[in-house]
């Protein structure tokens, strides 16, 4: 039994080493951009915000890292610099979202899908991979703003972010 246990533990160690190497090889900014681009194409997105943060103080509780991907309009207004200005005809903005269309709903395809729709489940899985790569690359206290610009190109901007 001891030999089997050691063999199993060695196998686990070997697999963990392989996973670490794969992450080092494939968890890159370029591949993160590819996954974000795939998410935008698959779900016809207009804008998302990716936020990872660790609080400096949590009222005695452990300060644990969290990360989220936001695509609802209310969340984007909170986490995306200037997102709420895209409707203002007098403000210069970079978003493709049309000023002339007050009925425009951001990320409408994804927001209109029922929660149990398989496409939404696939979106959550892809979003989880994006969050994992973002955390691996940027660790914590980051914000990534992604949007389709007026020319129809995907823009990705990362900045430091502190939620305290």
Residue ranges: model-predicted function:
Residues 2-164:
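Acidic interaction surfaces
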